[in-house]
Amino acid sequence: FEVKLNAGPTLVIEYKQESGYVPGSDVAPFSFHHIHHNYFGYRTFSSNGGEQIRVGTSTTSFTHGFNLIEYNYFEDERIEAEIISNKSWDNIYRFNTFIGNDGAMVIRHGQKCFVYGNYFDGKSGRNRSGGIRIINPNNTVFNNFLENIEGGKGNSKFPISIMDGLVDSPLNGYYPADNAIVAYNTVLNSYGPAIKLGVVNKDVKTPKVAPKNVIIIGNTIINSIGDNDSPYELTNEIGYDINFNKFKNHGIELRFLD
């Protein structure tokens, strides 16, 4: 798939809404789709509505999809903030490759999703690339390798971002990333903090609520670029547990951080 220039995701998983379906209360039937070994090449649109893959919608975001997305190659997607937009529960994203994109792998809605074993190289020279962004509770990100993520250089996109939610969030809003687990990831030579806790959407003025019970453990962060020697950045009100992470900056020996 490549050179799609009009609105709408390249590939969509839609869930069937039975008669009388109530968004946010009902769930649609499972889908069990397997998306694998595809190439998603150059496309550009705007900052919203041009994803390569979208799994569900906010209307069906409480659906347990049980979809598996693996061994896909994503390259040179421009402007759009979300390369993959997850919008349902119980999906797995593994062993995918992301090269020179402007966006991120985003758990936009849904819970109990796993993102692991993926490779990200954000080098493009456009200073827009992101890595993995977590919204909504009970999601797990582990054993990913991310390098050259450029979005922390003025565009508030980081290798791993854990977002605040909204107070009384609507279904299509932002729920806090409570109980997120970020474990055993490697971040190499990226701008800004490697792990940013408490990211907000500045365009949404509704009061924010910080995520709780976030676990960050066993990650390795190595940096020899930029002028920011902070491996992670967090807001004071977040409940978190940070243990056994390793950090090396500008030649300083690898050390454990608490």
Q: What is each residue range found by the language model?
A:
Residues 1-257:
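Glycine- and acidic/polar-rich repeat regions and solenoidal domains
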